[in-house]
């Protein structure tokens, strides 16, 4: 997860060997992607659903992908069935596909080698609510069978439902990592007052880290401690709640406020 321009797609391109990192290395299954024997049999990749030849049919796209990595024609039919593309749709030119259909085709291409890992950049783009529900079930089933899915998304509610672990990035840096439950538990206390400047000063003097967010101040301590400090400083609180009260969306906005365009504009 991360705001536009945070580096989500760049990170995925580094994982799949398309963009060299300035330092360090990215490993998949313990190796660089380029060092994997026949990578498509181990890692299924969809970074841009529109990156298909518009003049080919959906079936031709999958047939070419299957031949490239050495799998038989039955994988093509299985892939089409898996992503819900009918024979009629498979016979249409990609230029006539909707964005949602291109997403399904791209996912079929990623799955065609029966990989252990999927790397998917915004796989739910263009899907309607039913399609998003279907995508969630497909990826959850893949993971439950022992596979690993690395995906980026801006659909926070869907991520909260399906993800086992989150990596939140901003400006190319990891700002938080862990399960949804772990991240929400670490978020301290959300507070508003009649004099936020004075409250920040009082909390800072007490050695408590305070961050401004769209939902108010976020203090890295318990609500009881914030209330006590505010009382001692004679500051009236108008809102006091666990930092996790706003859920994943508020957590995301808080952690990435400094990197987002909206945060910089504010």
Residue ranges and their predicted role:
Residues 135-221:
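ABC transporter nucleotide-binding domain
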Residues 1-151, 156-157, 161-164, 168-170:
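ABC transporter nucleotide-binding domains
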Residues 17, 40, 182-185, 211-212, ...:
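Short, flexible turn/loop "capping" segments at secondary-structure junctions
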Residues 222-266:
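C-terminal coupling/interaction segments
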Residues 79, 93, 215-216, 243:
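Residue-level "edge-of-site" marker
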Residues 34, 53, 71, 157, ...:
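Short alpha-helical
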Residues 30, 40, 58, 171, ...:
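ATP/adenylate-binding site constellation spanning eukaryotic-like Ser/Thr protein kinases
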């Amino acid at each position: 997860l991360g705001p536009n321009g945070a580096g989500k797609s760049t990170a995925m391109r580094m994982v799949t060997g398309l963009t060299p990192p300035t330092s360090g290395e990215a490993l998949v299954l313990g190796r660089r992607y380029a060092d994997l024997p026949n990578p498509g049999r181990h890692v299924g990749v969809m970074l841009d659903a529109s990156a298909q030849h518009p003049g080919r049919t959906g079936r031709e796209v999958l047939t070419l992908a299957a031949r490239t990595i050495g799998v038989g024609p039955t994988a093509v039919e299985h892939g089409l069935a898996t992503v819900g593309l009918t024979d009629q749709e498979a016979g249409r030119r990609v230029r006539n596909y909707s964005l949602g259909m291109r997403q399904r085709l791209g996912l079929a291409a990623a799955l065609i080698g029966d990989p252990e890992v999927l790397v998917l950049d915004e796989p739910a783009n263009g899907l309607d609510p039913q399609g998003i529900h279907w995508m969630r079930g497909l990826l959850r089933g893949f993971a439950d069978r022992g596979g690993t899915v690395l995906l980026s998304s801006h659909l926070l509610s869907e991520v909260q439902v399906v993800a086992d672990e989150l990596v939140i990035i901003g400006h190319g840096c990891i700002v938080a990592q862990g399960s949804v439950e772990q991240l929400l538990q670490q978020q301290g206390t959300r507070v508003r007052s009649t004099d936020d400047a004075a409250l920040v000063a009082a909390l800072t003097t007490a050695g408590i880290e305070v961050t401004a967010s769209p939902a108010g101040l976020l203090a890295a301590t318990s609500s009881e401690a914030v209330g006590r400090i505010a009382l001692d400083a004679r500051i009236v609180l108008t809102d006091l709640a666990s930092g996790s009260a706003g859920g994943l969306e508020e957590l995301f906005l808080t952690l990435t406020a400094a990197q987002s365009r909206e945060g910089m504009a504010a």
